[in-house]
Amino acid sequence: MKNCYQKAFQVFFLLSITSSLSFGQAKWKPITQQTKPWSRWWWEGNAVNPKDLTYNMETYQKAGLGGLEITPIYGVKGQEANFIDFLSPKWVEMFKYTLNEGTRLGLGIDLANASGWPFGGRWVTPEDACKNVNFKTYQLKEGEKLLELITFQQSPLLRYVLPKKTEISALKYPISKNDNLQELAIDQIKYEKPLPLQTLMAYSDKGEVMNLTDKVSAMGQLNWEAPKGNWTLYAIFQGWHGKMVERAGPGGEGDVIDHFSEKAIQHYLKEFDKAFANTDVSSMRAFFNDSYEVDDARGQSDWTDDLFKEFQQRRGYDLRNYLPNLFSKENTDLNHRVLFDYRTTIGDLILEKYTGEWAKWAHGRGKIVRNQAHGSPANTLDLYGLVDIPEIEGTDLLRIKFASSASNVLGKKLTSSESATWENEHFLSTLSDVKKALDLFMVGGVNHIFYHGTNYSPKNEAFPGWLFYAAVHFTPQNPFWKDFATLNHYVARTQAFLQDSKPNNDVLLYFPITDRLTEPSPKGLLEHFDGVTPEFNGTDFKASAQKMIDRGYGFDFISDKQIANLKTQNQQIITGGVAYKTVLLAESEQVPLETLEKLVQLAKAGATIIVHHKLPTDVPGLGNLDERRAKFKALLAQLNFVKVNAQLNQAKIGEGSFLLGEDLDELMIYAKIYRETMTDKGLQFVRKTSAKGNYYFVNNKSEQAFEGLVKLEAEANSAALYNPMTEVLGMAKVKNNEVFLQLSVGESCIIETFKTVEKGKSYPYWKASKEAEELKGTWKISFIDGGPTLPKAIETQTLGSWTNAGNAYQDFSGTALYQLNFVKPKTNAQGYWLDLGKVAESASVTLNGKYLATLLGPTYKVFVPNTLLKNQNKLAIKVTNSMANRVIALEKEGTVWQKFYNINVSARLKQNLGKDGYFTTKGWSPRASGLLEKVSLTPVEVLK
């Protein structure tokens, strides 16, 4: 079979090649606790004990994990006697034991700052709980008095996860007084109660505004007669949003805090100070905050006690004078400006009063913070910028880049990811699927992988153990755990490079949040920012970002606040200790005055600013509008554009210039910004700066194997090549700044470039010298690990799914050993590709007693040196399938494995939803398992 290749071989090639050896300039970096992948570690019901904690942690450590983030969540039914309340003395004792074991085993420990998410719990009072705004309007004419009492009765609301009828009238107030919150699994609750009046404002048809709040009695009676004109009265009442902590464990159930209130977060965190007051938790690394999901509920948490005060201090005018504009549905410029100012104030409060206070609290206790900012009604770039480790999740590369952009722009060392959150339906995700997800994160700038996730489960718990409702199930009960270490070693080797480097991107893409904050939303007053989609669908911002991804331009997003700290040096833009070549504005309509002032200042100092399509036209917001608008127009007037060519105009200013044009590629070329053309060939990458040159992490995302030269924009007079999966390394073929690569589907490599000509052992490239030869004979298949039982061994001369052998084989999940004796091929060669064909799902290969490789897919090939083959050969392949078939069997026999409080395992796909509202495998057929196609050897020779 021609062009049958995969870079490298496993563990050895003639000489033993391991991570401890290096060839010339090619050398693996040290593996540390931090370079290894970590995992979210769910403590269900906090029902942990020292013996099983040790068992679990030792198992994780042996599999190659570097650390764990403890997130206590809902419990397991039947384990109530073992439940431990979050932050109780017993819980702190178990946490301290875990820290000690982590130190012994070399496992780092982070802790979620809540039992579930968002921040909240039983100790959160109604005063500190998340709020919302409610309003009523009244109409009066001259001489009229309002007879109606100014009151607002909050309507009752009860949303819960469990399909169980619960009457709100049976629940005590406040919610923390109820003892059965674990069973109730309440998601949101609003009690029927009168709401306090915050303000009463009157607006005449002539533009007059009056504050009538002090004219309202305690009973709600307004003592006021309308003067001349027609008057509209707005009464503002502060209510309770009612959001409860999601997936909370025992002791952690309760109200979510007000994320806009400094006193709320301070009161909340005091509970942790109290719990840890007499305990040494110095070995703990970080506190963690999950994504902002306060508004995953009915309505929005859109208010706080002192919003009017904060608004006036920050925006320079009284919001109470513009309540009709804030709540209006009409699309007018004034309404949009007031809405912008309201949303900006909310964003400021989350940034300063919540995220900032949380980080300050943690730092004061010697801890760092990891934060998921996505989903917040604020500029996520700024929220990420306040924390030590920004964390992202998802499968959209543009979304991923928000967290890494903040790290890159502000000089942070680590960007983490909640990885493979729900890669496939339960029990179907493979290690190959996970690797694909991890590669995307690393291409997006992530260098600190966290799996989502791993359940604490007692050693003797029956299959499938304790599980989380939405996960790949990185747990020892999953058969793929046997091969999990292979993936973890791959991640560790890759992250060792990605952590020991600095970002190397050319473009700072301005995040035009102003345009979104100005636009009303049918969902409510707030606008949440989760990424680029769907918030920026149809915008040039999204189109330009995607084009830069597709065309191979390195870029980071940047916010207004971050632009304020940029500097120009040698015609480059400096931030976070790294240099960029330009700031790109992609058809932004409104830009803050301060941002335009800074961009002009940068250009005057020698920078190049690129504007795609058109310049911004106005400033946002209402405060001091005329003065700001005049200054804005004066700045634009300084930009005197001259046509350079049909595609491009330039305005020189000071030592630099603004470039304006329709064609993004033309603008980049004129600014001397050049793309990495490897993206044209189906390759994706991230480029980093190393001590001696650059690193490229390159992944073949296409459906075809790649072989050929790849032009690099970084200077490469020589280059080292590393395969982090196979551990093969050596000096690459380089010609005219082009590096020769061979990448199978889904395969990755690391290129290290040097500005000088470095010498060393060459990287081995292989090409097929003859056609593939099928390995024929009698295969013996023995079932060696798994369940529910170990089926009898079988023999076959034709490979196919072992589920075809009968019911016992259909029910089996685990590992089977395939053994074959074969004669050495007649064709002599320098080596051979052993191709397993299609495999379900992973395979560990041994030949003549020598371990070769563990193959995760999607390509199942391994290099065999000719010195290993004998006249008579013994091939042994351990194939591991998924959990699915055993779970299917459990359901068929009526065994109850879904025994969890709260959500109790939900379906990712609707077709897998049972009548009870839970996930089910009913209707599933057994999944194909084992070696599914012929196995072959292909003679290969060195490609010169």
Name these PLM-found stretches.
Residues 22-274, 278-284, 931, 938-944:
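Mature N-terminal, pre-catalytic/accessory segment of carbohydrate-active enzymes
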Residues 202, 573, 651, 843-849:
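Short aromatic-centered micro-motifs
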Residues 571, 586, 594-597, 611, ...:
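C-terminal structured "cap/appendage" subdomains that terminate the fold
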Residues 117-120, 124, 139-142, 158-193, ...:
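An acidic-aromatic loop/edge-strand motif
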Residues 822-848, 855-856, 875-879:
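Aromatic-lined ligand-binding clefts that engage carbohydrates, nucleic acids, or primary amines
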Residues 1-26:
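Bacterial Sec-dependent N-terminal signal peptides
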Residues 38, 43, 49, 54, ...:
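Carbohydrate-binding surfaces of carbohydrate-active enzymes
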Residues 221-224, 738-741, 861-867:
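Exposed aromatic-hydrophobic patches
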